[in-house]
Amino acid sequence: VRVQSLTLVAAGVALLAPAPLPAARPSPPVAVREGNVRAADLLAKVRDCVPVSKGRYRSDARSRAEIPVCGARGAVFWKADMDIDCDGRPGLLCNGRNDPLFSGTTAYQQSDGRYLSAETLPYVVVPTPSGIWDYRVHGIRGGSVVAVIYRDRVEYAVVGDTGPREIIGEASYATAKALGIRPGPHGGGTSSGVTYIAFKNSRVSPIEDHAAAVTVGERLARKFVRGG
C-alpha cells in the first residue's frame, strides 16, 4: 500500500510540473512611430516631381532606370524600393557570416572614428556622385537628415553611406526594422512604396546621435509640411 501511495504522489507531481515551452520563433520587425508629423502630410508635399537629377536611377541592377531625384523647397526626394544595407561595424546580425556581401566599412564614420552600425543606427544610402546626380550640390552630406516614409510610418535617419552610381533606394537594417520592413540582408527590404525626403543643409553631429536626428527631423518635417 505504501508503494502504491508513493506512486500516486509521484504521478501527481508529474502532472503539476510545467510543460516544456515550444521553441521561440523569430519575432517580426516591429514598426516604431517617431515624432508627430504624419506620413500622409509629408507625402502630400511630394506628389509632383520636378527632377533635379540629370538622369534616372535603377532600383536594382536588373531593373530599368525610372527613378528621378526630385526637388522641393528645402529638400530633395525620391520614391523607390528599399534594399538593406548591413555593412559597417560588425554585429550579431550584420557580419561576414550572415551576409556574404558584407563590407566592414561605411562612407561616413562615427565621432570616435569607428564605422557606423547598420544594426543600431537608422541611416540611408545615397548613390555615389555621378553624371546622373551629385547629392553634395544640393546641400546633402554625411549626417544630413532624411525622413523615410513607408505606409503610415515615418522614420528619421541620416545619410550614412554611399552606394552604386546607378542605383537608388537603400537603407540600413535599423531603418527597415523601425518601419516594419523585413530587415535581413537575405530576403529583406521591400520592392516599392518607400519615399525618402532628404533635407538640404541639415546635419546631425555626432552622426550616430539618433535622438538628435529625430529632433532635427521632426522640426524640419513640420517646416516642410507648412511649405517653408
Question: What are these regions, as identified by a protein language model?
Answer:
Residues 8, 139, 168-169, 189:
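Active-site-proximal structural scaffolding
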Residues 1-26:
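Secretory targeting and sorting signals
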Residues 123-125, 158, 195-197:
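Soluble periplasmic/extracytoplasmic beta-strand elements of cell-envelope proteins
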Residues 186-195:
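Intrinsically disordered, low-complexity linker and terminal regions at domain boundaries
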Residues 155-164:
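Short beta-strand-centered aromatic/proline hotspots
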Residues 165-175:
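Short, solvent-exposed secondary-structure boundary/capping segments
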Residues 25-153, 166, 178-186, 200-228:
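Cell wall/extracellular polymer interaction/catalysis modules
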